[in-house]
């Protein structure tokens, strides 16, 4: 035992326990005590050196152990010395102590079949389900030895019959038992041919079909290995599966044949349905091997012989169709599809389909074929990617492949009526048939970053994708960049607009229902224009991504992206293509063209604004000023950079200033005319909020109210009843009547649209900070409409977006009840009215500050940079006093 390193007293105690010498153990543990009884029968008497050591030495600890961790109690239990075990337990020996291999005293007694000792240990609280480091339990070691009495005792004491996982309370297991075979007590008894123990375990519910990990052997296979016919019969009677295959694909019948146990083989032969493969079958390659070799004829023979082979799954969970899609052999793909291979099956590792494999490996012809055969483009891999997402991840994606997948994905979304919560494509709809995709013939390509913004572009309300609370003078990186500005790539030529569906920036707030609504075709125009005018660079630097925001998105806290909405003011007439859009009724306000949104779809002319500079959409340049309308109305566009920025948008400084000077003279008269201008054919549209200051004035330090000249030219008696608001500050360019407008709805829309336009045009105002979702939740709770909260959360509608919703938007969100929509619209109207008054006070304060500042700095103002702020004060004060 290697006791040389132990103290003499410990060596004597361990030797006495191993030999069953109770007297010596008592002398060592109780110095000075008289022996009560002699040594146990069969035990060696203690030598004179042991007696002297016991008389002269100090007491020896009862839980001492040798180098292997075996304690005195374990040695006594292994030897079956019941009196010594009883004495050690009385002296306080630990009943559940383990040696270095995880063996306890009970396991030692069970291994050797000592029933009385095992019973004594169980009475003192020994763990009946303890396991050693090999994962063997107390019941397993007892079954291995065939000790029927101990097995029965353990089962009656509560031992788990199929306990094959390591016990977590064992201090020495270390979790390594999970990597072992997982042998159960039944398997141990079968392996060693103990029929009585097998019968007892089966009566206690042992699982006859439990298999050992890593090798896949069952108890029936172990019986076949030993040729134990009686044991095999017991197992089959209890439900053992004779068709079970090991990892070597062998059954118990084949094991018996290999071991030449004829009687056992004859017994298992009629019970086994999985027949052994012949030598020819073993030599014949499977369909995966044939696909890897590209042998079309062999694949065809295998598929003809058994069509089920086309849907086999290999170790990685891949199907033959996936392998063919990777290799790029179109004839093989066609053959497998004709044999009814599952095109939409996903592998078990990554969740990829055959379409994803073909897309990722650039096999364009296979992608076309699979799409024509109806492969599902909406399926997502385990990481959430679709086939379209995968092609966008490529460093140099094939442009035609991108168009192909994009058109089909849009058609799928169109067929489904509306995009799901996570559609597979960043764009919404397409006009091409699914089976025969027709792609735009252009040479550009989508950028890889476009897929990152897909979820934002498809939302009902897009303003939550824009940064909030940005300063009015924040630099914008699209000014002098060598590549095309995004608004330029999105526009169509002005002379061709009547033949197109309309610019995408005008379609994002329309409805999906109803004939002639451009929303159902917006995504196609968006995709087509992006493909035709995509920037030549394959990737954009990461530091530019924050600036890649399409100009047609509704503004959040400044009006940079509303420039393209000024088409109604170009050349003094409305854009014919925009008259097909539903209206958002709006009260007139001093910024932009002075007029209100009407309810009809007739084109409206604005002769007073014919001198306005071209908007960025038609000029191809981008205005730096966050408050510029791109020259749409010629007013409200002066920023801190003065006329220089207006000239960048294609306009003239003199033209802008002359219009400003002319229009600011009639700011007061304009406000008086407003109630008369708000009547419309669809119902009352009188605003519930007081008129506000020009929202572009406070933040930019320059801006203007409408003057007398513009008011005179836009006299209500001469304005068509369907007058469209020429301001570019509208967050929803909706210009045609809703399907079923009502008076209350129109009134709510008026307040929502007008107030939101004014609040958004103040670049650094407080309106951009209203983003608390709790506020929106509280509003819905007050209205007792909490059931619609998940709808707003799903569409990411924050408080800022909520204030811009119209009746049509609410219907599109899924709020079908008229009463609920009316409640929400009334709440929006009241909120916009209150926030408008708050902004008015703030704007007046900021305006007074700028007026004082400009007056002090008027001596240093460079000529041509715009009029002094001091000259802008009187019209604003007049307007405020009349409010």
UniProtKB/Swiss-Prot annotation:
Site, Essential for ANKS3 interaction: residue positions: 821
GO biological process terms on file: determination of left/right symmetry; heart development; in utero embryonic development; kidney development
Keywords carried by this UniProt record: ANK repeat, Cell projection, Cilium, Cytoplasm, Hydroxylation, Phosphoprotein, Repeat
Domain SAM as annotated: residue spans: 771-834
Function (record text): Required for renal function.
Description of how the protein assembles with itself and partners: Homooligomer. Interacts with NEK8. Central component of a complex containing at least ANKS6, INVS, NEK8 and NPHP3. ANKS6 may organize complex assembly by linking INVS and NPHP3 to NEK8 and INVS may target the complex to the proximal ciliary axoneme. Interacts (via SAM domain) with BICC1 (via KH domains) in an RNA-dependent manner. Interacts (via SAM domain) with ANKS3 (via SAM domain).
Name under which the protein is recorded: Ankyrin repeat and SAM domain-containing protein 6
Species this chain originates from: Mus musculus (Mouse)
